[in-house]
């Protein structure tokens, strides 16, 4: 957005329009030629390329060097590791890899995954914490920043610190 606002694209002879589609996943929209390229997360691309009917897309670059996401809870909740997830409610996006990551992290921490209640998030972000759910999966550079800007203190459990495979 800043580059567009400052005219950097135009200075290089590029006519750029930034579109934020809400109807569909990034990989699907690019495959349907509703965008020239998209910026997405690794799991979206992996699923698109390994599906029974793979999407005609190609990953060409990474923007960040490592996973910058993790689980969050309210700072005063007492939930500071996956060992604390038992008996709690997790709100997520319902992606196919989501449960597998939760289960792996909980198992590694000695917790019973079957004791975690999983619901689909209503999209309200950090505002849902402590109300409709106890924990969520946030992207540090976006969701955690937004929560901090709104005075919401969080416990952040970075995925790559919870399991080296992540």
Language model: regions and residue ranges:
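Short coil/turn segments
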Residues: 74-78, 93-98, 140-141, 159-164
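Short beta-strand and adjacent tight-turn residues that come in two discontinuous sequence segments
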Residues: 21, 39-40, 62, 92, ...
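A structural signal for short loop-to-beta-strand junctions that line the ligand-binding cleft
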Residues: 55-64, 88-91, 155-163
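Ligand-binding cleft/hinge of the Venus flytrap
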Residues: 1-14, 99-118, 146-153
């Amino acid at each position: 957005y800043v580059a567009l606002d400052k005219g950097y694209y135009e200075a290089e002879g590029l006519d750029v329009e930034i579109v934020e589609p809400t109807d569909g996943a990034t990989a699907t929209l690019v495959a349907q030629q509703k965008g020239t390229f998209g910026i997405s997360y690794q799991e979206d691309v992996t699923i698109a390329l390994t599906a029974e009917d793979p999407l005609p897309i190609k990953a060409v670059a990474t923007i960040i060097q490592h996973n910058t996401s993790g689980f969050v809870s309210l700072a005063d909740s007492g939930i500071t590791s996956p060992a604390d997830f038992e008996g709690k409610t997790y709100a997520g996006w319902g992606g196919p890899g989501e449960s597998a990551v939760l289960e792996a992290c909980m198992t590694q921490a000695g917790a019973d995954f079957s004791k975690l209640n999983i619901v689909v998030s209503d999209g309200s972000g950090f505002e849902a914490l402590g109300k409709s759910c106890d924990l969520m999966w946030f992207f540090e550079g976006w969701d955690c920043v937004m929560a901090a800007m709104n005075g919401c203190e969080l416990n952040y459990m970075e995925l790559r610190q919870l399991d080296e495979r992540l």
